[in-house]
Structure formats: structure tokens, C-alpha cells
Amino acid sequence: MQLPLSHLLACYILASSIPSWTTSTPIMPAINKETLYLVGHSRSLKLTNVACVISTYRGQKDGWVERNMNYAFSVGKPWRGQSSTIHVQWRPYAALMNARTSDIVRHDLQTKPQYVVRNYDDNSLVLSDVKDESSPCSLWVTRKYLDNIPETTNRTFYHQCPEPIYTTIDEKCFENK
């Protein structure tokens, strides 16, 4: 049995349009040039008096992405700012992301050498400790999503992270950067 030429043409048009229906692979925001803002974390991280945690891209070196980690201590006036270089490394589709930070950042922000990538898209990222399934998390977004966290990312943060707390990035953060 032969298909009429019009059916073959219709099948070809349908099949050739399928790639445009799918979305492309998201770009991991921790290794691209976007500025990232910490907008949530697990209560157990106890980031006492730390505000405005912002990570900016600096470049790449020896397979690692260099980023500035800027944050402020919200005690007293004016806020006391802190800045340090961190290094992150992530292999495409890997479940783990490596991080190298200074002792000061490790103390102030309780950073770890490795994180589980729970969820990411082009503009948001949920990281957690490597310990176990219900380990402390952090939620990062680009400026575009400061007021509107993507639904899948938000759901991941809320359901997979113990005692999630949302933080705010207000205008003081940009004044004290």
C-alpha cells in the first residue's frame, strides 16, 4: 500500500517541526556570565546578619569559573560589605558542582567544597549539601527572576529543602555592593 504524496509531505512537515517544539538544554547559571542572587536557603544554614548575597562572574581559569561573592553584614549603619573570589566547576549534566572558597567565605556563608545540583534552568539554581536526601539548600536566581522564581525551581526548593526560608534583595543591597 502506498501513501499518497500529500500524506508523505504532511508527515515530513510534522517531523521536521518537532525540534522547534522542544526546548534547548538550559545553561547552568553558576558557570555563565549572569549575576546570581541568593533568594532562599534552609533555616539550618543560619546566615545570621548576612544579607545581599550576590555572585558576579569574573572569568574562567584552568577549568574553573571565577566569581566574586559579595555580601553584607546587616548590623549597624552603614552595612559592612565583604567580597571574595570563589571558584566553581561543573561538568555538563553532572549531579555535583565543585566549589573553592576562602576561609572567610566558608565561615561567613558556610560554603562547602561540593554541592548537589537539585535543579537548574537558565535563570535559577537550587544547590544542596552532599550529605543526604534532606540536606540544607540554597536558592539562587538571576536579576530577571528576583520577584518571580520559576515554578519548577520554587517547587524543588520548597519540597526538597528542609525548612526553606526566602530572603529579600532590596535596594540597600545594590547600594552596599
Swiss-Prot record:
Notes on the domains: Each monomer contains a pocket that accomodates cholesterol. Cholesterol derivatives (such as epicholesterol, epicholestanol, epicoprostenol, or 7-dehydrocholesterol) could also fit in the pocket with minor rearrangement of the side chain. Since arthropods are unable to synthesize cholesterol de novo, it is likely that a cholesterol ligand would be bloodmeal-derived.
Organism domain of life: Eukaryota
Among its keywords, does the record have Protein biosynthesis? no
Q: What is this protein called?
A: Japanin-like-RA1
Where are the glycosylation sites?
N154
Quaternary structure? Homodimer; non-disulfide-linked. Each monomer accommodates one molecule of cholesterol in a pocket.
- Keyword Cell inner membrane recorded: no
Report the source organism: Rhipicephalus appendiculatus (Brown ear tick)
Q: Which keywords annotate this record?
A: Disulfide bond, Glycoprotein, Secreted, Signal
Annotated InterPro entries: Calycin (IPR012674)
